[in-house]
Amino acid sequence: MNLLREYIREILLTESVDPKIMSMIDELEKNGGYAEVFPDRVILFQPTENTPRRWVAMVAYDTVVGAHAGGRCGGAESVVQSATAKTGLGPLAYDIAIELTGGLGMISDRASVSSDARAVWDYYMNNRPDVIKQQLDNTNDLLTPEKDDNCEQEIEGTGGTAVDMFPDNPRAWIKSSLSKLYKKSGTPVMDELRKRGMLR
């Protein structure tokens, strides 16, 4: 019986849109907006009379190999290169970008992350049961002997590697949302946007 409940829960999570993301879709639609997918970025537009292609949020990414992410990074498809939002719709752009990886996942920029972007990653780690979190290792194999999960971990500050920044507890960095790979098993956000005619 527990397995059946777990299975049903998993189906519901992969088929449903997070309520906060749904409210962002509603807001974008109310303002005549839409999402456009490019080979290297997702941009949310809210047109105005004077500016028909007025953008309000953007997440740009590169392949893990193209970004020289420093390892296989758990098989991640892409790494965020930059993100910006003029409104509170940034997380919607992130969700679309994660879904575009086809279940392979996305990681944060490996060199620097703004406080706004960190808040998005923290939210994914702590509040999004529909998003799969996978712990990454550093390039010195601190957590596992396997190489597939190795990924640069220098994003926790500017004093060397993440492990160097916690000399008394080298495993402390694993609590960081930036040391994870994030992926989704379905595309409910893109499906909802497509259903509303808001995905280009």
Describe the predicted segments one by one:
Residues 17-30, 36-65, 69-73, 102-200:
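Terminal substrate-recognition subdomain of acyl/acetyltransferases
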